């Protein structure tokens, strides 16, 4: 059971090297969940964004992949391999130093993250969106979050 969940949202300016200062809700949760001071960053299964989580969450992801493999193996065994590649092969590590990370270039490119990243807690992980993509293509709640943070950033 995960005791400390990622709950909250925030926006971060992304520098030219992909560096960003994590919002307080992410920094606080990481410090409670892991002494590793790093995040694993991978591609979201269905949305055009990234997911970030501490190394201890990998076992939860593995259990979910296995549960779904068993449930879907008669329908399409290929689904499992695609899901497993995305969950475990399309992942990179980012060190957390002084509350900052550098998004790996491959991950930034995959999610088209440019100058402003929207981070949204999803319980065991954090979704990382390009704020403009979230505004233009997200569901109603995501659109509202992105609009709020973009407006706030522009007013600053």
Name these PLM-found stretches.
Residues 1-32:
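The feature marks the first
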Residues 4-6, 34, 87, 111-112:
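Short solvent-exposed loop/turn micro-motifs enriched in small/polar/acidic residues
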Residues 25-70:
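Acidic (E/D-rich), amphipathic helical modules within compact regulatory domains
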Residues 124-156:
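Glycine-rich, aromatic-bearing surface loops/beta-hairpins
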Residues 18-22, 26, 52, 99-103, ...:
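Short, structured motif recognition centered on aromatic/hydrophobic residues
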Residues 32-47, 109-134:
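A short beta-strand-loop micro-motif that forms or neighbors metal/cofactor-
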Residues 55, 60-61, 66-101, 106-108, ...:
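Short, solvent-exposed interaction modules
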